């Protein structure tokens, strides 16, 4: 299993941002190999973290090539005050499988 973690500092979100965000989420959920996602927000720092879980790197690469994702990436400076992406391979998972995930298998 792999994760793609998108950590960002928010600016103002407009209708275009929300439409792209919904389109990216729908595209991710339609990709074979998508396992789920979770979102965390730190109110003290203002940072948000979206974690997507994937069966394979190939599934993640499909999302990276999605037109909505490419549009959001090109326009990120309008909505974000900086971001960082972390791609990781999960070696082990313990506890309640799927706890905290939306759209868990």
Predicted regions and their residues:
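Short S/T/G/P-rich N-terminal loop/turn motif that feeds into the first structured element of a domain
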Residues: 1-48, 57-65, 78-105
């Amino acid at each position: 299993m792999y994760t793609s973690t998108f950590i960002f500092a928010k600016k103002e979100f407009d209708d275009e941002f929300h439409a792209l965000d919904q389109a990216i989420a729908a595209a991710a959920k339609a990709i074979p190999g998508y396992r789920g996602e979770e979102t965390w927000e730190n109110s003290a720092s203002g940072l948000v973290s979206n974690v997507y879980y994937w069966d394979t790197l190939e599934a993640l690469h499909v999302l990276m090539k999605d037109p909505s994702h490419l549009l959001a990436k090109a326009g990120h400076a309008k909505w974000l005050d900086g971001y960082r992406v972390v791609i990781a391979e999960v070696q082990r998972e313990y506890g309640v499988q799927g706890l905290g995930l939306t759209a868990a298998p």
